Amino acid sequence: MGERLKGKVAIITGGNSGIGASTGQLFAKEGARVVLMARREEQGQMVANSICDDGGEAIFVGCDVGDHDSVSRAVEKAAAAWGRIDLLFNNAGGGAGSSFPDEPIEEWQRVIHTNLTGTFFMSQAVWPHLVNAGGGAVVNMS
């Protein structure tokens, strides 16, 4: 286990698979307490359990980043669990399901809402916690 993130609490959106899950594992290996957030609870809990099985500290908190109330509740749960938030890794998002020339505007709007508005909601909700922690970091994936 590393020490670069020892004592830090990191929220990772889209933490139930892919880059988010791998980032959660890496942060935990560096000593962070990891809060994985995603909509798919079963997958997210499996990743959290895997991190804990490997000697790290992780919890899963269900969250739809495109829903302001869901984000507010999830961030407060994260802060209550470990008393602080030091890092936000905005990773939740996705692409359209159809090819560009055929993409309906509704699909485009859904992608924009999750990928951009969700990043805004999360960053805004976490910001006061970063200030209270004396600083921190927000990382936005694209």
Predicted features and spans:
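Active-site loop of short-chain dehydrogenase/reductase
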Residues: K8, G56-E57, R84-I85, L130-S142
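A short, exposed helix-loop element centered on a Lys and neighboring polar residues
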Residues: S123-Q124
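Conserved NAD(P)H cofactor-binding loop of Rossmann-fold oxidoreductase domains
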Residues: N91-A96
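The beta1-alpha1 cofactor-binding region of Rossmann-like NAD(H)/NADP(H)-dependent oxidoreductases
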Residues: E41, G62-A74, I105
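Conserved glycine-rich Rossmann-like NAD(P)H-binding loop of the short-chain dehydrogenase/reductase
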Residues: E30-M46
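Substrate-binding pocket helix/loop in short-chain dehydrogenase/reductase
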Residues: S99-F100, E107-I112
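Conserved glycine-rich cofactor-binding loop
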Residues: V9, N16-S17, R40
